[in-house]
């Protein structure tokens, strides 16, 4: 069971090594990187490549670790008891399985995605340590222990919004997805847009990386935003020549709303354009 990428996902050699090492060690794969570098999609593509079921747990700021195990609805049970509902005799009717429970009892070895773990509070990773390490947990309401028949392949993503605890990090295999270089990005583009004109890609990538390198950019455009921009360029029939011969005093590229998503960055480019016009007089 090895991951070699898929036809829809360009995986670097380092990323393939990281995925396969985590699988071999039976450790969670902790993936960090800029937003839009394919961290979440990685879990989806691992599941596709290995023909494994995918279970997704998208973490929010209000998410608690126990929700990944199960949730007990005591309020509904109390109400049903007052109404004389026969279901109250079996407490299992009021227990909702969480994503870890689903992964532990899956018929086939699944890929479990715990997405954006750093959005939750600082104690969230520590609260999952034992369950992820031992692959079991206890349900207090029923007195049963849920054990994983086979360890799921766990992929955990983080955008570095918070530092993760050392004890949690020790139990993971870590990989940082670097922002793609020009050659890798060209391969990604060709996967999404087969047959796209090479000259358009070349000019678009040149402009894209120039924008990312502008000092003071608050939000640099991501891979997904580049793909959106290229799609618009093709729909609007913007040629490679238009990108190459653009007025250097304008600076802001055509259809820039797909790339520049922050008003401060728009103002930055407007100031740079003003300075270029002033200096060119």
What are these regions (language model features)?
Residues 1-281:
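C-terminal regulatory/interaction module of P-loop NTP-utilizing enzymes
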